[in-house]
Amino acid sequence: MAISCIPAQPRGYAGVPASHSKEISSPSRKQPARDTQNGQSKTSPNVSKSQKDLIRYEGYTVSFNEKYLIPNWVSYELTSTETNGPYSRKGLNFSQDPSAKVKQAEDDDYRNSGWSRGHMAPAGDFKWSSRAMVETFYFTNCCPQNQSLNAGQWNTLEQKVRDWARRYGSLTVYTGPIVLDNAYGTIGYNKVVVPDAFFKAILAGEQSIAFVMYNHNNNENMQKCAMSVDDLEALTGIDFFAEQVDDFENQVEATYNLRNWGL
């Protein structure tokens, strides 16, 4: 089946050669330590040396691309109870993470650029913790994103992820940018790379699904943006959910059923 939202094969995933990025291990959830040394997380000795920078926050983990100044991917678990909480994004603005020992974008890079500050780990998934909410507003979790996409189909997909967490009890979620031919160039003094597209990969028990959306005013039907995790892995060169047993991973990632996701 043709899927109109799938971009052409990228040169590499957010600038990381695909042959290397396949080695990345899936991070565990909610590790408070997030210091990095020599480009490798102190809390993740099993992370491949090909990994650029891994930063662990209270609610999510980010693989950060210091060359492009955007994430390679973010990953977290979302449970049904975490879809609601007392903490709001009100009054929060993006800023640099003072604890991250990596070069980061600045607010001036985005100002008057024509691109929105797009969360990869959405603030709405972290209402259960004040600290986790604040940490979603670091530039280590941000990409230049088309505002119509940010407030439209991408926002709809983020809301559906919360619906699926309530339905299935728990999800593992990966989100990130895809850099193709860098058609949109860079923004700001620091030359923050503008992605060509964005992806989500979602695992719920014994089923999975993935989505890709171009970084423009994307009005494509959600079903047309869906694909198997295997297809997304072929597109990005990333091995999602690598902590799963190979036979289980291969079976679950090979197919997807839109009806299981209410699509």
For each feature predicted by the language model, list its residue ranges.
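N-terminal module-boundary/linker segments of secreted carbohydrate-active enzymes
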Residues: 2-71, 78, 246-263
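N-terminal start-of-chain detector that recognizes signal peptides
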Residues: 15-16, 23-37, 44-50, 88-95, ...
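Context-gated lysine
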Residues: 22, 30, 42, 49-52, ...
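Short, charge-rich amphipathic segments
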Residues: 39, 74-88, 156-167
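Short, His- and charge-rich active-site/binding loops that engage polyanionic ligands
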Residues: 55-117
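Domain-level detector of nuclease and nuclease-like folds
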Residues: 98-263
